[in-house]
Amino acid sequence: MKFVLLFGVLLVTLFSYSSAEMLDDFHQADEDELVSLIKKEEARAKECTPRFYDCSHDRHICCRSELFKDVCTCFYPEGGDNEVCTCQQPKHLKYMEKAAGKAKKFGGKIKKWFG
């Protein structure tokens, strides 16, 4: 009876080890594929227009800030007839980014206290 139990434990251990190796190989293949897709996407990306620069030639090309994409905002300057468009960050998104930064900083402090 002890021999059967010992043999069963050995069999389960070998099976779990082999399945863990298969899963590691599977995850490694997924990571390699994901990295290659990201590199292709970066190569395909166009140059973006920085904040407060003219975006009248393409209104969808503004750069991203930390969390949100800037928006091409058009307006007429005082005493002018021609429209001026610049990439800007709306105020509500600016406040949301500040709040997210403070929450992230506070989360780090809590993690340091309890972790």
Curated annotation (Swiss-Prot):
Please identify the protein, giving its name as recorded: U3-lycotoxin-Ls1r
What domain of life?
Eukaryota
Mind telling me which residues form the propeptide? 21-44
Supply the PROSITE patterns for this chain.
SPIDER_CSTX
Is the Secreted keyword given for this protein? yes
| Entry GO MF terms | toxin activity
Q: Which InterPro entries match?
A: Spider_toxin_CSTX_Knottin_CS (IPR011142)
The answer to whether keyword Signal applies is yes
Q: Which organism is it from?
A: Lycosa singoriensis (Wolf spider)
Q: In which tissues is it expressed?
A: Expressed by the venom gland.
Q: How far does the signal peptide extend, from start to end residue?
A: 1-20
A single cellular component GO annotation:
extracellular region
